[in-house]
Amino acid sequence: MSRVYEINVAKSKFRDAYNAGNLDGLLAVFADECTDMSAGAPSFFGADSKSVFRSRMTRLFEECRATLTVTVIAIRVFANTAFDYGWHSLTLMPRDGGKPITTRQRYFETWQRNSNGEWKIDFYIDNVDVAPMMPGADLPIPLAFCPPDTQRQRDQKLARAM
């Protein structure tokens, strides 16, 4: 079995566990010592990362039914290390009957092959996807690179345009 195929199988287990609300199945895809840099949340490292992830996902699965669609753009393998990147489209249906919420995130993961030959995610980072634009378009400057005054001016300009 090819290593790329093995990563695809592990990624499918990730998706299937997410969609089933299977916390143990979801956590099984992650290394015991990992890094989580999920958008909109503090970063966590090592054993704390998996513990915090467990708490977050327990709450999420209690409050919502989740439907995760994974689009893998590429998987690159280098011996016992690999990375993949793509999109996660997540629809959350509140269990209390509220309206569903759908988000699309760009993600990047690194994988390590452990001593049992299993591929585990040891680094995860994502951010909100944005609409594609042509290179010649009036591309926005990422807010992370803007001084606070520029952000404020940009927010005011956007508010006037709405």
Predicted regions and their residues:
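A solvent-exposed, acidic/Ser-Thr-rich amphipathic alpha-helical stretch
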Residues: 2-10, 23-80, 87, 102
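Juxtamembrane/interface motifs at transmembrane-helix termini
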Residues: 45-49, 104-105, 139-144
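Short beta-strand edge/turn micro-motifs at domain boundaries
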Residues: 104-138
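Short glycine/acidic-enriched loop and turn motifs that connect beta-strands
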Residues: 90-91
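A generic structural signal for short coil/turn motifs at secondary-structure boundaries
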Residues: 44, 94-98
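A short, structured loop/turn motif at beta-sheet edges
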Residues: 75-82, 98, 111-118
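Short, low-complexity N-terminal intrinsically disordered segments enriched in polar/charged residues
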Residues: 1-33, 80, 132-162
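Acidic surface patches and DE-rich sequence motifs
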Residues: 38, 94-95, 114
